[in-house]
Amino acid sequence: MKVPEDLVLVGYISGAYGLNGWVRVRPYSADADALLNAKTWWLDKPEFRDVAMMQSKIHSGDVVAQLMGVAGRDAAEALKGATVQIPRSHFPALSDNEFYWVDLIGLEVENLQGVRLGQVSDMMDNGAHPILRVAVPQTSEADPKAAQELLIPFVEQFVITIDQTAKKITVDWGLDY
């Protein structure tokens, strides 16, 4: 088995769906197109392997899918907790000003005044819009009451520019927010 070099973690199996071996996947993105369109998923449970994805659909914000060789609820439940990876080359093309969340993680965040706020550690969806989770750098005399993390809405009002080449996001966000 040749493992693709461009695998990207896109979600995890949260449990079984129904009685016929379907699995429920919690995507790590608001847009699950990559999961829905990939014909092969790479799972890390019970061992790292590729599995053919036979069919899938969105259900209550998750992806439910039928995987080759997973027959029955018990087999699907045994995959609970497995991470799902797919090759980056299988991701659908994006339009201008669209980004995959995985590409934003690790970018530096600074405000319009040029103050470094931290680094994107994760993204989450609050139902209304995505949110940048920014890990705040701690000084040597760290104030125990100081914020460890900033939550910045990922909307045009606050996110001014995203420069993937410079690995930087500029936001309209004050230090006192």
Curated annotation (Swiss-Prot):
Compartmental location: Cytoplasm
GO cellular component terms given for this protein: cytoplasm; ribosome
A biological process from GO: rRNA processing
Listed Pfam families: PRC_RimM, RimM
Signal sequence range: none
Entry domain remark: The PRC barrel domain binds ribosomal protein uS19.
Functional summary from the UniProt entry: An accessory protein needed during the final step in the assembly of 30S ribosomal subunit, possibly for assembly of the head region. Essential for efficient processing of 16S rRNA. May be needed both before and after RbfA during the maturation of 16S rRNA. It has affinity for free ribosomal 30S subunits but not for 70S ribosomes.
Designated name of the protein: Ribosome maturation factor RimM
